[in-house]
C-alpha cells in the first residue's frame, strides 16, 4: 500500500486517514528524523477541519511515545509551518491539512528542519519504516524518556512579521480597498491582520470556521462569491485563499477571476523590472502557451517541471531560480518563503499595482491565456502511457491541428487528466471527444 501522494498523505478522515495511521505515520517520520535531530522538538500545526483534533492527538501520541517533545500551534497556514519549523529550531514540522479539499478529507505533510517539503526518497523511507513492525516497536520509549507536548498560541506574530517583511518598505496599502476570502480556513486570523497592519481597507468574507465549512463554496476553488463582493464594495482587488493558504486566486476590480498563468507572468515581469529575478521562472507542464510566449517576449528564461509545488521548488533549486508556480495558484517566492504562500503572493501583487499605479485588470490583461480544456476521465487501469499503442500518433495528429496536449494520471485517484490547449475553443471541444474515446478504449474505462 502506498501512503504518500503528490502532496503528503491524504484521504478521508476516519476512514483511510484514521487515528491509527496518523499515530504510526508520526512514529515512522520521527524515526526517520532521529538521525539528524538536534533539539528533539517537532512542530505540529493544522487547518480548521474538525478531524484535525483527532489526527493532531494521534500524531502527538506517536511522537511522544518515541521520545520527541511536540509543540502544537493550532490553526496556521501551511507556509507558516514551513517558516516556523526553521525559525523555532525544530527537527521537523508537520501540517495537518487537505488543502483545498472538502472538510471530510484531511492530510499530513512533513517539513525538514529547514522548512523544506520532503523529497520522494525521504517519503519512500518513511513508508518503509511505517511497514516495519520491528523498527516501530524498537523505537518506543518508557519512563522519563517519553516526550512532552505543549501548546503555544502566540507564534502567529512571528509569521506575521515575516510576511510583512516581504512587502516593500517604501510602500503602503493605504490607498487599496481589498476583499479577502479566507475560505473558513487556516488564514482566517493571519490574512486580515497582515493587510490591516500594512494600511489596507479590508473586507473579509468566509472567516467563521466551524470545522465543517472549510472550502465550502468559498476560497480559491470557488472565487465567484469573492467576485460579487469585489464589485459590491467597489474594491480594487480581491484575494481568495484555500483552506491552508498555500495558494492564491486573484479577482480584479471588474469582478473577473484572473488566470493563474496570467498572475505568474505579470509577477515574473515585476521581479525582472526590479532586478530581483534570479535565473529561470519555473512553471509546470500544465502551464498555458500564452505564459511561455509572454516570458519569451520579455526575454525571461523559463523552465517546466511536473505538477506539484514541491517539484517547482526542486527545479528552482536546480536552476538557481527564485520564482515559479502552478496555474492552480501555488506561487513560490523562494526569497521569502520555502513553499507556495498565498499571502506573500497577494502582497507582491498589491506591490505591483501600487508601483505601476495600474488597476488589477490592466496588469493581468497583459497575459491573455489560450483556451484550455481539462477533463478527468475515470479509468479501471493505469497502464504505462509511454507504451500505449496509438498514443504518439494521436499526439502528432493534435499537434498538426495546432493543439497542445498533456495526458497524466492522478496521483491519488483512478483518473487520467486530459488537457488540450489551442486558440480555437470549438476545435478543442471537438477533439476532446476523440481523445476521450481513445482513452476509454485503451484503458478499459
Swiss-Prot record:
Residue positions of the active site: 99 (phosphoserine intermediate)
GO cellular component terms given for this protein: cytosol
EC nos: 5.4.2.10
Protein name per the record: Phosphoglucosamine mutase
HAMAP family xref list: GlmM_B
PANTHER family: PHOSPHOGLUCOMUTASE (ALPHA-D-GLUCOSE-1,6-BISPHOSPHATE-DEPENDENT), PHOSPHOHEXOSE MUTASE
Chain's role: Catalyzes the conversion of glucosamine-6-phosphate to glucosamine-1-phosphate.
UniProt cofactor(s): Mg(2+)
Organism: Campylobacter lari (strain RM2100 / D67 / ATCC BAA-1060)
GO biological process, one term: UDP-N-acetylglucosamine biosynthetic process
Annotated cofactor note: Binds 1 Mg(2+) ion per subunit.
Record carries keyword Protein biosynthesis: no
Gene: glmM
Phylogenetic lineage: Bacteria, Pseudomonadati, Campylobacterota, Epsilonproteobacteria, Campylobacterales
